[in-house]
């Protein structure tokens, strides 16, 4: 059969498209392959069928239902292009003979448009609440045929193809259909199954691009491989109904919130005979080890450093490229969901670190995705982050706004995650963040605020409140931006909590001073109470404080070995008795000497030493006290929950305060930050009678010197510190006491 478009001067447009169209198809530059390929009516009840299958030896057409041969498609002058005419239009299969074997499948170009108009409208509007079930690779059934529907946003592309092992990564085989005006390309590939690796081959305005991973991928290959994978639907049999029903109450602002921050790949690992890391644990293996440990220590939540797929392990997850896919380093999405389910069944909440501020420049990722600045700002003064050599999301573009919003909801709704800690919020709020004059672009009002990011954060918090009731959204925000945790209808950003970076910097600076000089830094510990109720705060001792030459938490402490441990115990006790929710990074709970290294597990061998076991025991007891006694948690965010007794004894480096519950129950906290025991130190109290020691951080239980008050003290009718009564206490060296009245 000849495939000339002209025969004796007459055109045959029905059998063959124009030479120009065929040329574009062969060169993989045709914008509408469905206009050429697949079945096309002949106007008389029959159909023409065209298939472009480079490398195929022959193609037969079978009746889809009966499997009988209807005829063959003929090859002609254009290699790979097969066409045929059939007098009756009916559903069909293609039997394709390749050099390596035979393939029988439905024709991808025999299916109509797949995505609904409402899905496309909501996506373009930036308000699709379940985008991870719409775009990307979706296992689905079309006209009774199982397969995978691919959909990707690339509005400036001239052509997009799906490539993978299933088509030997040949972009000519599966070019996609463009859905105007959304800029979304789609294609259904029948009989494709879960687990297939794939990417997109994109012809941009300036030519072919490096193969791109799917921005909406639900699963990925194990790094350093970079392809996306077709993921099966999440089919976990959730057993956390009790947790989810009670979550809103558990995560109320007046409830205890004590967070154990960890990096999943370096908390514990399988090690070889030399003690070197042999492999990272899977989610199932982590659950077996981590959940009992966290539960025993009394933490209410864990916070995972980013587990979204990221190409570079040394970024700790803070440069993710797959905002919808858990990292393949630890298992499948199903495995991750099972891990969260297990945490919930044990009464432990799960918070994820989440990065909507920036993304890495890897060529297989989002950068110049369709040959243009699609996800990022086009102007480097807006779109390039100098500190991290990353690109900044253009959240002013509705599709990007909606992409990140959908990512947040994906984790909260599909995986039952209890909260998101939003990374690097300060870098989002300011256009001149870490930039010199002339290196940034003002907003439309001439100011430095990033109005698009502000709108996004407010919208995020409003939507999460509606779509994931009871979930927390927490801001890592290091500036004095007002109203971070204020409601959006009151002009705030709407976060549940803000990390108190000021408290962290001041308190760590103080505790690193030699006690001889602490009198000159006395206000550094008390200053945090000046603004403690301006936001709802979390007190963070995070991973950032134990890396990059900052020393581990215990190694920051001054003095000899005994003093270092005493300082650490006193600091942690001060933190747990201070207003604000708690966050502690892994390893700090037992005094690891080394800085954290993401390539090694924690130094668990240290727990053979009593001082390290003592710190661990103290953290467990602090958590139990914090959860048991309402004065330590139920008025964290209001000044009525705190009362200074002694804040000005700089000479002795002593502080004392009361914590009050909503019901009027007090606890007394007294801290001595010198190595000198203070005998007979008088402290005013509001209640007469016996006061029991709930905690002494110098107790022998924690490998301390056991100096103190024998577990109790009795009030005297002598006024002090604005109170009608007082206690005379022995203050242990470098220690904190917490006492409670018996009556």
Curated annotation (Swiss-Prot):
InterPro entries to which the protein is assigned, alphabetical: A-amylase/branching_C (IPR006048), Branching_enzy (IPR037439), GlgB (IPR006407), GlgB_N (IPR054169), GlgB_N_E_set_prok (IPR044143), Glyco_hydro_13_cat_dom (IPR006047), Glyco_hydro_13_N (IPR004193), Glyco_hydro_b (IPR013780)
Q: Which GO MF term does the entry hold, naming one?
A: 1,4-alpha-glucan branching enzyme activity
- CDD domains the UniProt entry points to: AmyAc_Glg_BE, E_set_GBE_prok_N
Concerning Pfam families, the annotation shows: Alpha-amylase, Alpha-amylase_C, CBM_48, GlgB_N
Q: In the UniProt entry, which residues are flagged as the active site? A: 423, 476
Record's catalysed reaction(s): Transfers a segment of a (1->4)-alpha-D-glucan chain to a primary hydroxy group in a similar glucan chain
Kindly tell me the pathway this chain contributes to: Glycan biosynthesis; glycogen biosynthesis
Entry's Gene3D superfamilies?
A: Glycosidases, Golgi alpha-mannosidase II, Immunoglobulins
A Gene Ontology BP annotation from the UniProt entry:
glycogen biosynthetic process
Q: What is its EC number?
A: 2.4.1.18
Q: Name one GO cellular component term.
A: cytosol
Q: Which UniProt keywords apply?
A: Carbohydrate metabolism, Glycogen biosynthesis, Glycogen metabolism, Glycosyltransferase, Transferase
Q: Which family does it belong to?
A: Belongs to the glycosyl hydrolase 13 family. GlgB subfamily.
General function of this protein: Catalyzes the formation of the alpha-1,6-glucosidic linkages in glycogen by scission of a 1,4-alpha-linked oligosaccharide from growing alpha-1,4-glucan chains and the subsequent attachment of the oligosaccharide to the alpha-1,6 position.
Tell me how this protein assembles. Answer: Monomer.
Annotated HAMAP family:
GlgB
Its name, as the record gives it, is 1,4-alpha-glucan branching enzyme GlgB
Q: Which organism is it from?
A: Pseudomonas fluorescens (strain ATCC BAA-477 / NRRL B-23932 / Pf-5)
């Amino acid at each position: 059969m000849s495939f000339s478009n002209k025969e004796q001067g007459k055109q045959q447009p029905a059998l063959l498209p124009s030479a120009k169209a065929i040329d574009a198809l062969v060169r993989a530059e045709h914008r509408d392959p469905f206009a050429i390929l697949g079945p096309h009516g002949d106007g008389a009840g029959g159909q023409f069928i065209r298939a472009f299958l480079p490398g195929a030896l022959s193609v037969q057409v079978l009746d889809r239902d009966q499997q009988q041969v209807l005829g063959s498609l003929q090859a002609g002058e254009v290699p790979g292009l097969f066409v045929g005419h059939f007098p009756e239009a009916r559903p069909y299969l293609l039997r394709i003979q390749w050099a390596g074997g035979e393939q029988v499948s439905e024709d991808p170009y025999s299916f109509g448009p797949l995505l609904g108009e409402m899905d496309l409208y909501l996506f373009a509007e930036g308000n699709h609440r379940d985008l991870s079930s719409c775009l990307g690779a979706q296992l689905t059934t079309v006209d009774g045929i199982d397969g995978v529907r691919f959909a990707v946003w690339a509005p400036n592309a001239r052509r997009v193809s799906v490539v993978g092992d299933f088509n030997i990564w040949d972009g000519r085989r599966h070019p996609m259909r463009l859905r105007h005006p959304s800029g979304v390309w789609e294609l259904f590939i029948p009989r494709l199954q879960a687990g297939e690796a794939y990417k997109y081959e994109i012809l941009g305005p300036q030519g072919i691009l490096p193969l791109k991973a799917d921005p909406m991928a639900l699963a990925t290959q194990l790094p350093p491989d970079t392809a996306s994978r077709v993921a099966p639907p999440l089919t976990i049999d959730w057993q956390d109904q009790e947790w989810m029903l009670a979550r809103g109450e558990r995560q109320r602002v007046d409830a205890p919130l004590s967070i154990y921050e960890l990096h999943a790949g370096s908390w514990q690992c399988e090690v070889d005979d030399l003690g070197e890391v042999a492999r990272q644990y899977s989610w199932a293996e982590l659950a077996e080890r981590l959940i009992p440990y966290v539960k025993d220590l009394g933490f209410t939540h864990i916070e995972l450093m980013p587990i979204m797929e990221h190409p570079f392990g040394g970024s700790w997850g803070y440069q993710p490229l797959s905002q919808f896919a858990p990292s393949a380093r630890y298992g499948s999405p199903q495995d991750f969901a099972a891990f969260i389910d297990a945490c919930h069944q044990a009464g432990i909440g799960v918070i994820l670190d989440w990065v909507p501020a920036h993304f890495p420049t890897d060529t297989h990722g989002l950068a110049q995705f369709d040959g243009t600045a699609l996800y990022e700002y086009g102007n480097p003064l807006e779109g390039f982050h100098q500190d991290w050599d990353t690109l900044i999301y253009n959240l002013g573009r509705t599709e990007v706004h909606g992409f990140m919003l959908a990512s947040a909801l994906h984790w909260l709704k599909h995986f039952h995650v209890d909260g998101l800690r939003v990374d690097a919020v300060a870098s989002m709020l300011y256009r001149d963040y870490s930039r010199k004059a002339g290196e940034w672009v003002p907003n439309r009002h001439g100011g430095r605020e990033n109005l698009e990011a502000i709108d996004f954060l407010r919208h995020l918090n409003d939507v999460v409140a509606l779509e994931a009731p009871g979930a927390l959204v927490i801001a890592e925000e290091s500036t004095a931006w007002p109203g971070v945790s204020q409601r959006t209808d009151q002009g705030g950003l709407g976060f549940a909590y803000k990390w108190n970076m000021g408290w962290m910097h001041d308190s760590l600076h103080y505790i690193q001073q030699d006690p001889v000089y602490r009198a000159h830094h006395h206000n550094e510990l008390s200053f945090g109470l000046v603004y403690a109720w301006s936001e709802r705060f979390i007190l963070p001792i995070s991973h950032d404080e134990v890396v990059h030459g900052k020393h581990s938490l215990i190694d920051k402490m001054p003095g000899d070995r005994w003093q270092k441990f005493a300082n650490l115990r006193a600091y942690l006790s001060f933190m747990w008795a201070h207003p604000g929710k708690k966050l502690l990074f892994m390893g700090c709970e037992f005094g690891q000497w080394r800085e954290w290294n993401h390539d090694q597990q924690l130094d668990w061998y240290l727990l053979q030493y009593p001082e390290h076991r003592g710190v661990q025991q103290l953290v467990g007891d602090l958590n139990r006290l914090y959860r048991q006694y309402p004065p330590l948690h139920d008025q964290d965010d209001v000044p009525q929950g705190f009362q200074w007794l002694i804040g000005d004894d700089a000479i002795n480096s002593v502080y004392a305060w009361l914590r009050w519950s909503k019901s009027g129950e007090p606890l007394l906290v007294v801290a001595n930050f010198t190595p000198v025991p203070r005998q007979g130190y008088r402290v005013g109290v509001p209640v007469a009678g016996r006061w029991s020691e709930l905690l002494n951080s110098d107790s022998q239980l924690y490998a301390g010197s056991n100096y103190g008050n024998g577990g109790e003290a009795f009030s005297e009718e002598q006024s002090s510190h604005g109170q009608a009564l007082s206690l005379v206490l022995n203050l242990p060296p470098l220690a904190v006491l917490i006492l409670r009245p018996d009556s």
